[in-house]
């Protein structure tokens, strides 16, 4: 019975409303933590996982040996690989596609690669103008890897102690 009486007086005096207004007023005059994104940017973690890239060896040969471990381990089924044997008997990829709409950027592909071929770069800002552009092909992945190889190698070397 006492609970009902207390609830009646709380609702009559609008105590819940006043408590909410007090909370709003209290936070109104505190410093803001909003970052105006395009002009200001937060520092990225060294382990940030962004856009994918395929790497090459220093002699120019692509690293991917078409083992398809990254395709098998991908929980979102975002990676599609086709391979063929070359004249020298080694396997190489003929098709390596990543659907960025499906990808959850978990990093399993990067961890499973035995030759460090597929990596996730620090690239955060990219866009698509048409629906089909969300599928990144092998030539595009190799071009990204070639363009950012120095930064990729530097980040991998800094993170090597933690792998």
UniProtKB/Swiss-Prot annotation:
Binding positions for [4Fe-4S] cluster 2 per the UniProt entry: 74, 103, 106, 109
Q: For binding [4Fe-4S] cluster 1, which residues are annotated in this chain's numbering? A: 64, 67, 70, 113
Q: Which reaction does it catalyse?
A: a quinone + NADH + 5 H(+)(in) = a quinol + NAD(+) + 4 H(+)(out)
Q: Name one GO biological process term.
A: aerobic respiration
Q: Which GO terms describe its molecular function?
A: 4 iron, 4 sulfur cluster binding; iron ion binding; NADH:ubiquinone reductase (non-electrogenic) activity; quinone binding
Gene3D superfamilies in UniProt: 3.30.70.3270
**Listed PROSITE patterns:** 4FE4S_FER_1 (PS00198), 4FE4S_FER_2 (PS51379)
Keywords noted in UniProt: 4Fe-4S, Cell inner membrane, Cell membrane, Iron, Iron-sulfur, Membrane, Metal-binding, NAD, Quinone, Repeat, Translocase, Ubiquinone
Q: Which cofactors does this protein require?
A: [4Fe-4S] cluster
Among the entry's GO cellular component annotations, what is one?
A: plasma membrane
Question: What Enzyme Commission number(s) does the record list for this chain?
Answer: 7.1.1.-
Q: Which InterPro entries match?
A: 4Fe4S_Fe-S-bd, 4Fe4S_Fe_S_CS, NADH_quinone_OxRdtase_chainI
Q: How does it sit in the membrane?
A: Peripheral membrane protein
Provide the 4Fe-4S ferredoxin-type domain boundaries: 54-84, 94-123
Where located?
Answer: Cell inner membrane
**Source taxon at top rank:** Bacteria
The free-text note explaining how the cofactor binds reads: Binds 2 [4Fe-4S] clusters per subunit.
Xref: Pfam families: Fer4_7
KW ATP-binding (keyword) present = no
Instruction: Give the record's subunit note.
Output: NDH-1 is composed of 14 different subunits. Subunits NuoA, H, J, K, L, M, N constitute the membrane sector of the complex.
What's the stated role of this polypeptide?
NDH-1 shuttles electrons from NADH, via FMN and iron-sulfur (Fe-S) centers, to quinones in the respiratory chain. The immediate electron acceptor for the enzyme in this species is believed to be ubiquinone. Couples the redox reaction to proton translocation (for every two electrons transferred, four hydrogen ions are translocated across the cytoplasmic membrane), and thus conserves the redox energy in a proton gradient.
Family note: Belongs to the complex I 23 kDa subunit family.
PANTHER family assigned to the protein according to its UniProt record, in alphabetical order: NADH DEHYDROGENASE [UBIQUINONE] IRON-SULFUR PROTEIN 8, MITOCHONDRIAL, NADH DEHYDROGENASE UBIQUINONE IRON-SULFUR PROTEIN 8, MITOCHONDRIAL
Q: What is this protein called?
A: NADH-quinone oxidoreductase subunit I
């Amino acid at each position: 019975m006492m609970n009902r009486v207390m609830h009646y007086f709380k609702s009559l005096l609008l105590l819940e409303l006043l408590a909410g207004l007090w909370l709003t007023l209290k936070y109104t005059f505190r410093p803001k933590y909003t970052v105006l994104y395009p002009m200001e940017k937060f520092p990225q973690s060294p382990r940030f996982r962004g856009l994918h890239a395929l790497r090459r060896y220093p002699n120019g040969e692509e690293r991917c040996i078409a083992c398809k471990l990254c395709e098998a381990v991908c929980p979102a089924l975002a990676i599609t690989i086709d391979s063929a044997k070359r004249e020298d008997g080694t396997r190489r990829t003929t098709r390596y596609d990543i659907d960025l709409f499906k990808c959850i950027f978990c990093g399993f592909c990067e961890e499973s690669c035995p030759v460090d071929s597929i990596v996730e770069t620090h690239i955060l800002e990219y866009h698509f103008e048409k629906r089909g552009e969300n599928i990144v092909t092998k030539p595009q992945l190799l071009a990204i890897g070639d363009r950012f190889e120095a930064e990729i190698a530097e980040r991998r070397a800094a993170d090597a102690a933690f792998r």
